[in-house]
Amino acid sequence: MKVAVIYFGGQYNHLIVKDLKYLGLEAVAITPDKSVEELKEFDSVVFGGGPYSVINELDKMGFAPDYVKSLNVPKLGICLGHQLIAKVLGGEVRKANKPEYGLTTVNIVDEDTILRGLKPSIKAWESHNDEVVRPPSGFRILASSENAKVQAMVNNDNSIFGVQFHPEVKHTEKGIEVFKNFIKICRK
């Protein structure tokens, strides 16, 4: 399976590629200046983190909004990628009332799909100033934390996922399980 990992300049993006390769996938780092057509060869897309804000810097994210809307493959957004998916598909993203940095308790409210095996909670690495406050229509919330209601979300057909935390960072408990679960879903 070939996975495009969209790089937005986040400090942990290389770890996403490393984890996916460790799990036996062909993971390729892609900058968002490639056209949608150039990504048609991929079986899934993972949107990594980065320094931008989808609130007022969507224009700095190249063709990434088009990837969200136009590529008909399973997608996983991590941190900024999670916020990007929410914003582009009609959810609401705002400056966080209380930004999260470091280890945070993430409470799993629905462990179906990408969070299978992680209930009741995990300690997860966070690094964000913005947050999804309302998922797009047709999405449900999978996890929350004390300061962020939408720590994880999925669409109704279980093909588009977002997580606010960083499963690729070693400090996140069972982070690799998020990727394993995503791969299982992609292979269905």
UniProtKB/Swiss-Prot annotation:
One Pfam family this sequence matches: GATase
Domain of life: Archaea
Known catalytic reactions: XMP + L-glutamine + ATP + H2O = GMP + L-glutamate + AMP + diphosphate + 2 H(+)
This protein's record includes keyword Repressor: no
GO CC annotation terms, alphabetical: cytosol
UniProt EC number: 6.3.5.2
Active-site residue list: C79, H166, E168
Domain Glutamine amidotransferase type-1: from-to ranges: 2-188
Pathway info: Purine metabolism; GMP biosynthesis; GMP from XMP (L-Gln route): step 1/1
Presence of keyword Cell membrane: no
Swiss-Prot/TrEMBL keywords: ATP-binding, Glutamine amidotransferase, GMP biosynthesis, Ligase, Nucleotide-binding, Purine biosynthesis
EC top class named in words: ligase
Gene Ontology MF terms in the entry: ATP binding; GMP synthase activity
Function: Catalyzes the synthesis of GMP from XMP.
Quaternary structure, from the entry: Heterodimer composed of a glutamine amidotransferase subunit (A) and a GMP-binding subunit (B).
HAMAP family: GMP_synthase_A
Name of the protein this chain belongs to: GMP synthase [glutamine-hydrolyzing] subunit A
Gene: guaAA
